[in-house]
Amino acid sequence: MFHQIWAALLYFYGIILNSIYQCPEHSQLTTLGVDGKEFPEVHLGQWYFIAGAAPTKEELATFDPVDNIIFNMAAGSAPTQLHLRATIRMKDGLCVPRKWIYHLTEGSTDLRTEGRPDMKTELFSSSCPGGIMLNETGQGYQRFLFYNRSPHPPEKCVEEFKSLTSCLDSKAFLLTPRNQEACELSSN
């Protein structure tokens, strides 16, 4: 009898706790309108890297020396290509340019990075105005990345990203400082 009462109390405690700290289901993450045939124009243009989350700090270590990153996404020469240019402002003030090409996977929402066959990127919508979330997985890592059209989105957007990724087993969180002026994106 005692065990049944104890089990019932724990059950109700679990229900109450779950109602207070609700985490969205994986299915509530909405993949963006990538149909595997061409990349929607609404996602092209300039983006700022705001925050990252991952199960461990090591999976975010590549962003530790970064102050800010600005990206430009452009349609590639084929409808299934996406050209990405970035300029990374390091905390020491240096500007580091980067380029890479994503390939849309037909029949999927996955993006594959040219030259990195182990890497998969999925795009998700964000309830934050001008926001987008990526889930990158590769050999030995998984991380969520939050981007916005503004270099300084509302704080509630960052908190929402942190809360959501925490529910998805991300224990480490990184917020880019964005204290320095962004580097200029090169045109080539």
Swiss-Prot record:
The keyword Isomerase does not apply. It holds the Pfam family ApoM. Disulfide bonds join C23-C167, C95-C183, C128-C157. InterPro entries: ApoM, Calycin. GO terms for cellular component: high-density lipoprotein particle; low-density lipoprotein particle; very-low-density lipoprotein particle. Transmembrane segments: none annotated. Its main location: secreted. GO terms for molecular function: lipid transporter activity; phospholipid binding. It is found in: Secreted. Residues 1-22 form the signal peptide. Coiled coil: none annotated. GO terms for biological process: cholesterol efflux; high-density lipoprotein particle assembly; high-density lipoprotein particle clearance; high-density lipoprotein particle remodeling. This is Apolipoprotein M. It comes from Pongo abelii.
